[in-house]
């Protein structure tokens, strides 16, 4: 089931981060488009269907919840950040600037200064190199202490023509958001996500700068616009994630590396992504490729 949710431009919200000195009033710019609804309204409707609307919403609407969250944070922050304006003043002004501490925050500094009084939230209260808790799970892919385990795919076990794909976060958008925007499009004038390869690897494959290439493995394939470099490691290709999927059979014409990466977790415990454990082959694209 897919329910259309509003974008940040279609709802009111508060923007903040634990390391920023500004708290921003994110005011709705336009009414929700089509049948889109605020996430809160969607879940409130679902809660009503199962008879727990009152427990979920606590008799507050969108703005009442923003006010409650702000005032709660304001009360807690007053001890460290000084006097902070009330919600009405904050919302009218559009932002609040808090006082920055005289010394920068250093992670675990309190613990290092007073390890007995400032214990960490671990069973021992200390930094644990070995975890009895994790070890007790009996997971063969995540034991109780750090250890190197051979990746499913890596250059140490690659065929001669295979390359290791790094699909990092893009520098011109957040994940895949606004991939259709001018800033993102400017990075791919041919409409295809760039892929960077060491110039020696490109020469060995008869490939040239600006050429449209096909990256592929047993899981799928995508196109990329080749960019050569002498600073990337030989045997490695780099293609940022975030291109919107543009499928043509098992091929993504836009250059989405998710068509190539493994859909597996790091371990039974963590279940993090292993997108960087990915081997591909790269060759010239033959025939029509334009989107």
Where are these regions (language model features)?
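Flexible glycine/proline-rich, aromatic-decorated loop/lid segments
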Residues: 1-26
């Amino acid at each position: 089931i897919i329910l259309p949710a509003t974008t940040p431009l279609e709802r009111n919200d508060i923007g903040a981060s634990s390391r920023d000195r500004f708290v921003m009033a994110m005011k709705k710019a336009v009414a929700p488009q089509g049948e889109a609804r605020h996430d809160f309204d969607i879940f409130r409707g679902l809660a009503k269907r199962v008879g727990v609307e009152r427990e979920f919403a606590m008799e507050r609407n969108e703005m009442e919840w923003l006010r409650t969250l702000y005032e709660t944070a304001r009360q807690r922050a007053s001890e460290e950040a000084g006097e902070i304006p009330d919600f009405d003043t904050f919302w009218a002004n559009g932002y609040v600037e808090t006082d920055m501490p005289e010394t920068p925050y250093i992670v675990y500094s309190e613990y290092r200064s007073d390890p007995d009084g400032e214990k960490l939230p671990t069973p021992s209260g200390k930094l644990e190199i070995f975890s009895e808790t994790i070890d007790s799970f009996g997971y063969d892919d995540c034991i109780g202490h750090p250890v190197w385990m051979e990746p499913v795919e890596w250059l140490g076990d690659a065929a001669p023509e295979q390359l290791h794909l790094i699909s990092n976060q893009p520098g011109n958008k957040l994940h895949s958001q606004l991939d259709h925007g001018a800033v993102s499009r400017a990075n791919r004038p041919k409409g295809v996500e760039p892929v960077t390869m060491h110039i020696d690897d490109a020469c060995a494959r008869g490939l040239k700068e600006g050429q449209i290439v096909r990256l592929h493995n047993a899981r799928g394939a995508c196109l990329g616009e080749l960019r050569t470099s002498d600073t990337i490691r030989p045997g490695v290709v780099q293609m940022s994630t975030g291109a919107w999927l543009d499928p043509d059979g098992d091929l993504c014409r836009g250059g989405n590396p998710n068509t190539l990466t493994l859909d597996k977790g790091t371990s039974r415990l963590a279940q993090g992504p292993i997108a960087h454990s990915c081997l591909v082959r790269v060759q010239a694209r033959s025939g029509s490729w334009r989107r």
